[in-house]
Amino acid sequence: MNAKLRQTGEQVLIVFNIFILFLLLFTSKLVLPYWLQPIGRLHTLMLHFPIAILILAIGMDLFRFSANNNANTFYTNFSRSLLLAGTLLAGITVVMGLFLSREEGYTGDTLQWHKWTGAALFFIASLIYWLRNKKWYRTPVAAASAFIVTASLIITGHYGATLTHGDNFIMQPITSTFIKPPVPLEEAVIFADVIQPILEKKCTSCHNAHKLKGELALTDSLGIMKGGKSGKLFVPGNIATSLLLERVHLSLDEEKHMPPEGKPQLTGEEIALLSSWIN
């Protein structure tokens, strides 16, 4: 990266720090126009780039103090440029995430943790970039910096995954093997033993306390009975006018079809069980 381009990047980095700080302080007052919402929705696509680049950059920065690398102008310049690029991309991702957080359905402590750890990661990476050429910035400090950045990436990613996929997404295949054995039909409690497991498997990743899509929570009976933004979820004894089954039976390419395209779909048996429960 030539000096002029790097200087421009550094100026943009300063602007990002100020802009992100402003957004964090006034997030609750932020109202996005509809034409900016697609930018926020690019957050989940964009975030992979700064993760990969920051890990590579911070690793290269750690090893630049060896005799061979320290004397290699290309190595030192490339590691510096890579760190700048990764930090700038992290800034773009944070802005997108803050925009996305203003959309309906994102709420709760998990969102707050993801927002603040993500912002902290960006500020830490920015600080490392500005301090990396100080005389006291040597291998021990670089190692500590690498550890902090890596830990921040893991923590931020964990909360982001929880928002996207729900609690226990990674360990669910293992922990599910320890779930209590199937209850005999004659002893089953219909909601707790039949209906709730279906909702937990297919619906609660988007309809929980952390990610309240459509203002609908499906994690407990109170939320199910309350319904969401579109009204009651079902009418007992009347499957024809129940919103739950209406959305389930929509064509897969319909925007309001549930679960959304790309998510695990309800099986015919599960739909039949939900219909019988409503009746």
What are these regions (language model features)?
Residues 2-189:
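Polytopic transmembrane helical bundles with strong interfacial aromatic enrichment
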Residues 163-279:
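Aromatic- and Gly/Pro-enriched helix-to-coil junctions and flexible linker segments
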